[in-house]
């Protein structure tokens, strides 16, 4: 079911989207986007304009879901638009080189709050406990595509070695602790959590090549939705991992 809303920023243009998309998280794509929004999305509270003369509310604006990415990731937001059946044009900020989608809907905001995605969530986000077991890896992949990192270092010859590849998460300490517990249960890896200067934010680093392999396969293998540039790095890691195993067998 779609909702039609007036975009107050675009001369009364009408657009539509499925505002019930997150009502039930029952497939890979929904779980993925939920995780991605947990990392890179922003839930905005409803706003009200009050008359200075009468003190009465003269205009209400619904709460909103907003996602902003670098302009090179435009195709990723277009994937989200397709899944949520959104007909609105993405906002392109040329000066900031960013792409943004903003969906006004109190329904979407309420549904996201069931999974701890609330306004000003960055320091208080907790790992949700109501996601189906078979969809957890897709949720984690979505979060990783938003706030995870696959970092490469090249040697003097410009070659990437398997030992130089670092995989990590950053997020609210409460979320990272819950995530680490899930990874212990699902793939039997227990990684080191390092707190930032602000103790409410932490990093999770994968400590070994084999643990990194287990994690990346867990989230990316046989998946159908992902951030293309992160997935390409996963493929590079796999290639380097095969080379690493072949050297060990010699």
Question: What is the predicted function of each stretch?
Answer:
Residues 1-250:
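Internal intein/HINT superfamily modules and their associated LAGLIDADG
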């Amino acid at each position: 079911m779609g909702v039609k809303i007036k975009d107050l920023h675009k001369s009364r243009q009408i657009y539509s989207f499925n505002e019930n998309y997150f009502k039930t998280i029952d497939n890979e794509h929904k779980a993925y986007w939920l995780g991605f929004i947990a990392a890179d999305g922003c839930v905005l509270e409803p706003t009200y304009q009050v008359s200075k003369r009468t003190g009465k509310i003269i205009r209400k604006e619904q709460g909103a879901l907003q996602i902003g990415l670098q302009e090179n990731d435009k195709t990723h937001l277009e994937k989200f638009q397709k899944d949520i059946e959104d007909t609105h044009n993405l906002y392109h900020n040329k000066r900031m080189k960013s792409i943004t989608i903003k969906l006004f809907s109190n329904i979407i905001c309420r549904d996201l709050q069931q999974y701890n995605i609330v306004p000003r969530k960055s320091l208080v986000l907790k790992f949700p406990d109501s996601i189906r077991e078979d969809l957890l890896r897709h949720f984690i992949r979505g979060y990783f595509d938003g706030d995870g990192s696959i970092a490469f270092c090249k040697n003097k010859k410009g070659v990437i070695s398997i030992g130089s590849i670092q995989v990590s998460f950053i997020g609210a300490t409460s979320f990272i602790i819950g995530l680490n517990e899930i990874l212990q249960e699902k793939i039997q890896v227990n990684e080191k959590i390092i707190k930032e200067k602000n103790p409410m934010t932490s990093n999770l680093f994968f400590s070994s090549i084999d643990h990194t392999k287990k994690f990346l396969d867990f989230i990316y293998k046989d998946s159908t939705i992902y951030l293309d540039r992160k997935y390409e790095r996963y493929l590079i890691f796999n290639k380097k991992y095969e080379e690493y195993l072949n050297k060990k067998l010699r």
